[in-house]
UniProtKB/Swiss-Prot annotation:
Function: Transcriptional regulator involved in defense response.
bZIP domain boundaries: 93-137
Pfam families named in the record: bZIP_1, DOG1
Biased composition (Basic and acidic residues): 87-96
InterPro entries reported in the protein's UniProt record: bZIP, bZIP_sf, TGA_domain
Name of the protein: Transcription factor TGAL3
Cleavable signal peptide: none
Length: 385
């Protein structure tokens, strides 16, 4: 029974295996026949892959030709970036060139200004040397020696005399400012009265020098001193007979010297009164001089007009002019008396006040005139429409 079943199974297996073997043999025979016929057999999978690769290459080649696709965009962007960089570089170069040109122009203008400034300095130095030479010649000829000497030679040197006076006064003013600065420092430092007294005496002696200087200047050119052209404009506005009014200066000092004793107060009041009276007398004398001088000149002119050009008329004319010249000599006396009044007022003030009060008074006087000079500078520097 078992043997019968095994034979049956083998028969069934053979039945199924024979067809398979036959099919395999047939296939092998077919392959051999195809090989002989020269037909290429390819797998469908192999065909599909080859087709995809060829299409990809073609597309890539096409994109490269037309500039499309991602590669073309990247190349375009790269070219745009390069162009922008070049443009920025060009603009930067242009700005640099403009900046260099501006710097060269500024340097050129600076050199021109420097050259003009140097030329101005050279010109000023030349003028200063010329003035120093004029001053030296004036000193050698015996005029305007502040320490004393004869000023009679001043009459023969009109222009040089006034120039020398202006230079000497400017120098005196600088030295005076140094004296005042020393006095101010000493007063603020609360120095002893003995030390302070030496500085006060130095300032008073310096005032003596300027009055001697003006005396010689008056002999050289009385009208120059009278006009006050050696002073600042604001100082000339308050000027009286070639200088300050003593009575007005005492009014300025009165409010800065307190407290004063009764005796000092009375002395200042009496000094102010006497100064005012002397000023009034000199002013009246000046008015009378102007009147008589004007009348003399009118008489001389009338003589020439009425008498023609005869010898007698010329003689009369010259006589009238000689009288007028003599009256101008009186003008010099008025200026000297006015300076003498100013000088004596300062000396009297010094005697009335204590050392510290006198020091303060000298500072007040100096500051007053300094403010006038500062006002003049501001006025001259004002903008003009």
């Amino acid at each position: 029974m078992a043997a019968h079943q095994g034979m049956a199974a083998a028969t069934a297996a053979d039945r199924f295996c024979l067809p398979r073997m036959a099919a395999a043999a047939a296939a092998a025979s077919q392959v051999e026949n195809w090989g002989d016929s020269g037909v290429i057999v390819s797998s469908p999978f192999t065909d599909d892959t080859s087709t995809d690769l060829d299409d990809s290459a073609d597309k890539h080649h096409l994109h490269a030709l037309v500039g499309g696709g991602d590669g073309g965009d990247d190349a375009g962007e790269q070219r745009g970036a390069d162009s922008s960089a070049v443009s920025k570089e060009r603009r930067g170069d242009q700005k640099m060139q403009r900046r260099l040109a501006q710097n060269r122009e500024a340097a050129r203008k600076s050199r021109m200004r420097k050259k003009a400034y140097i030329q101005q300095l050279e010109s000023s130095r030349s003028k200063l040397m010329h003035l120093e030479q004029e001053l030296q010649r004036a000193r050698q000829q015996g005029i305007f020696i502040a320490t004393g000497g004869s000023g009679d030679h001043g009459h023969s040197i009109g222009g040089n005399g006034t120039l020398a006076f202006d230079l000497e006064y400017a120098r005196w003013l600088d030295e005076h400012q140094r004296h005042i600065n020393d006095l101010r420092v000493a007063l603020n430092a609360q120095m002893s009265d003995d030390e302070l007294c030496e500085l006060v005496d130095a300032v008073m002696m310096h005032y003596d020098q300027v009055f001697r200087l003006k005396s010689f200047a008056t002999k050289s050119d009385v009208f120059h001193v009278l006009s006050g052209m050696w002073m600042s404009p604001a100082e000339r506005f308050f000027m009286w007979l070639g200088g300050f009014r003593s009575s007005e200066l005492l009014k300025v000092l009165a409010s800065h010297l307190e407290p004063l004793t009764d005796q000092q107060l009375m002395g200042i009041c009496n000094l102010q009164q006497s100064s005012q009276q002397a000023e009034d007398a000199l002013s009246q004398g000046m008015e009378a001089l102007q009147q008589t001088l004007g009348d003399t000149l009118v008489s001389a002119a009338a003589t020439v007009v009425s008498g023609g050009g005869g010898a007698d008329n010329v003689t009369n004319y010259m006589g009238q002019m000689a009288i007028a010249m003599a009256k101008l000599t009186t003008l010099e006396n008025f200026l000297r008396q006015a300076d003498l009044l100013r000088h004596q007022t300062l000396q009297q003030m010094h005697r009335i006040l204590t050392t510290r009060q006198a020091a303060r008074a000298l500072l007040v006087i100096s500051d007053y005139f300094s403010r006038l000079r500062a006002l003049s500078s501001l006025w001259l520097a004002r903008p003009r429409d």
